Amino acid sequence: MNRLILLFMSLFLILTSCANREDIPDSIFWINGTHAVLTKVNNADINRFGTMAPSNTNRTRVLNTLDNSWDITTREDLDYMIDTLVVGRHNPFFLEQAIAYGITSMTRSEFELEIRAVQERELVMFFRNMFEAYEAFGERAILGWDLSRATQLCAFGYIAEFYTYDEAVDKALAIGKVIQSQFNSWDDFYSSYFYGYAYWSEDDLENPRSEYSRRVSIFNNLKADSKSPLNLNWNLELIR
């Protein structure tokens, strides 16, 4: 029995072993930073492109995730989803709603006056998140949420074997340059990301035990970690 346990533990360590930071260049480590919060949520490896080692087991795991969470079953599906995220998948719907609710034309004082009439706590959080996202970023309101998932899908595409390593890295670096052009810093980018996550998840933003609060805590821990990609220069040249 003890031998079986040791064998299982050895196999587990092989499948889940973490890469060393030195194994990847700064540019790819920077890309890992763009989806680092979700990588940590998934208990995956922030030091490895793909967030896990290539293996049959991990390929099956990622294929199931892509199918169940994204309805992606082919390379063509993946290409389409990434392209859609890069130009904005949830962001356009967010803007449509913000316009419909009159959010985009309100000053802060006007918003604060209007929100007093809203009784439901969940709606107050929803509208406040929407107003603050638009006030901070305008038409890029939650684009960070879309772009973060685009780079992650590039990494998953590699593990799923829809892309070669070179194809996935080239796609991710191209998206990284878009991210740099749209946002000014890691804080800037992740502010948009969290506005988007709040919009998509409809989570309780005031509950310290909510998934939203957990992700914010992960982000703050990453910023405090000197070995985190979030401490790389935001304007790092993204080349191979």
Model-predicted segments: where are they?
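Sec-dependent signal peptide recognition
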Residues: 2-9
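C-terminal motif of bacterial Sec signal peptides marking the signal peptidase cleavage site
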Residues: 15-17
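Polar/charged low-complexity regulatory segments
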Residues: 19-165, 169-240
